[in-house]
Amino acid sequence: MKMDPRQLINNLKPSSTSAATATHPHCTPFTLPSNGVINLGASEYFTLTTNAIFNPECTGTADIVLTGAGTPTSFVDLRDPFYASTIPACYALAATTVIAYMLVIMLLITPRTFLVQGAVVLGRRGFTNGPSGSDAGIGIGGRPWLQKVAALTVAISLTIATADTFRVAEQQYELGLMNASALQEEVEGGMELKIIRIISDTFLWLAQAQTLIRLFPRQREKIIIKWTGFALISLDVLFSLLNNFVYNGNSRPRLFTDAVPALAYLFQLALSLLYCAWVIYYAISKKRYAFYHPKMRNIFLVAILSLVSVLVPVVFFVLDISKPTLAAWGDYVRWVGAAAASVVVWEWVERIEALERDEKKDGVLGREVFDGDEMLEVTPTSDWTKRFRKDNDDKGGTATGSTWPAMSGLANRYRSHATNDLETGSVPGQRTGRHLLAVRPPLWPTRPQPAATPINRADTASAESTAYTVRYHPISEATPPIISGDTTLSRSNSEAISISRSISNEEVDSDKPVVLEQTNQAAAVAAGLHNWQWNSLNPFKHRVQGPPAEVSLHTAKPPTPFSSHESSNKWDVRARIEGFAATQAERFREKTRPTVDTDPLPLTVIPAPSRRRAVATESEESDTDSISPTPDESSHIEVTTSRRDRPARTTDPYTPDSLNQHSITHRGSISFATAVQPELDQRVENATASPTLVGSRQTPTFSSSRSSPITVRSPVTPSLPPIIDGLPVTTIPAPPRRPRVENP
């Protein structure tokens, strides 16, 4: 078979018979059949043994190919940039997955730490106990369960995304291509990832709302943040469901064609911007502690991590507009950044609050109270998450991880969790061991109960009362626990010790004794020590709440030996691990602690100078011995220690009747120092042996009428000088008054 050469290759020089070939050259390759003869020149012929494919040269594209042959840059625009390829996407996904699992480990396993005199030390309590105080110092590290669930769902979501990414990347590798956009669309289009991502986003927004609630102390602000966050989170979840399951699931700003994807993107952007703005505002308001403090120098690193975590979602939202191709791996960074924004900021806020409490623990001001806040029942447990709990955290004494812990200091600590408090007085047998350990000390000392009838000045709580309560509590002892049961804190069951003694029965009502109320503490202390070994390493057991951290740091407590065999539950692995870590940390601190020189220092005793009272006493004693009593007066000895020469006075109960008495003031209570009984007995014996007798001075009676007769005072000379502070003091008697004679 012989073919015409002009029918095959003469396209550049068309013949006159083939006008269509000249005007419309075809570029479609065609097959040459076998057994054909091809003529390549005058003497070159060869026969095709098999079918051959002939690709003609296209006149329309030949010049373009030849022109671009020397310029390689013309072919670069046909590919995506490197930051939008699959390699950065895979690395970003791997890094974010590792960070997510690190957050989960930090929230669930890491033990609690405490700030003790500026040093952050390891504690025995885990993060499951929540942000409560500690006797060792100010606690840092409590985490709510919303953060734990959010971090766990983010880690699960990124794990699913990693598996799908490697599966799609393997398919593209087998085809010999790399398409990051197609990989991202196929991974995000999976049904499993859509469901877990909606759940994860919900818990992330809730955890961020909980963190914002802790930033602001006022109850009004907390309520506003809670309900505003509810509204925005609900709308975001609604539009995310519509975008993923009703529409095509588009999340690129430049590719929006419907309103629902744009609204879903808008609510995500609004939540991120609001959270970032309020965290930055809080950092500026707490700039004294937020960025640097001498007692906690590493807070600068926590501040940098917190600001980066809250700014990362905002930065990548902006990059979606300017660099759309960067969104292939920017979604993963935004995802884990939202989880870190809640966890790291919570740690930052705890450290700031710890520094504030450590600095203000020596102050005299109490807790900050705002107008409109009800402090009796508004506590962190009264939040919207309380309805989802099954463990009933109100039975405990501390704020657990399921609470809003912004106000977990004063109100929650002193709430009446037990069934029988000091004022109701229920049956002791109805109280269990758990309730016995949950009793809290009262917020302020309980006032004595006033007597009913008849009215007794010694039992009333008014300013006219003749008995004043003094509660003695040395600084070297811890705050005594409260006795549970039928016992009520009143005068009837307290041990009244009267220091002032009087022999005369007429002046019993005029004297003011000092009453010391001491409660029996042996039973409560024994019960606390009996259950201490089992409760020390159990992180799920509510423990006895001691005094606040601001008070307990100033109380001297005996060192309690720590035993490594304290856990009664052998399957409590977490408690054993935390106890072992705490024991090793204590041993390491004991080894590294510098030795303190305990040699006794030299003691120098400087005697006190002589007082002027000694000189005055000698002269007064000489004058007293020269005075003798009248024969018509009754000879008896009167020993009194308060209001000896003056009548009882009810107008001013806070001023001592004699200048020799000392006024002892304790929180508004005033009592007068008197001589003790042994000194009185000694003085009575001396007076009996002396030949000089003393006539008693009768106390005049007061009447409301000015015309009532007045009892004449008889001259009297005191023979028993009172003793104040160990020094005898003699009182100079007043001269006798003349009786008033009425005009006839």
Swiss-Prot record:
It comes from the Eukaryota. Keywords: Cell membrane, Membrane, Transmembrane, Transmembrane helix. One of its GO terms (biological process) is cellular response to pH. Residues 387-396, 586-596, 633-649 have a biased composition (Basic and acidic residues). Residues 696-715 have a biased composition (Low complexity). It is found in: Cell membrane. The chain crosses the membrane at residues 89-109, 223-243, 260-280, 299-319. InterPro entries: PalH. It is a multi-pass membrane protein. Its main location: membrane. One of its GO terms (cellular component) is plasma membrane. Pfam families: PalH. Residues 387-407, 441-460, 550-570, 584-664, 692-744 are annotated as: Disordered. Belongs to the palH/RIM21 family. Required for the proteolytic cleavage of the transcription factor pacC in response to alkaline ambient pH. Might be a pH sensor. This is pH-response regulator protein palH/RIM21. It comes from Botryotinia fuckeliana (strain B05.10). The lineage of its organism: Eukaryota, Fungi, Dikarya, Ascomycota, Pezizomycotina. The gene is palH.
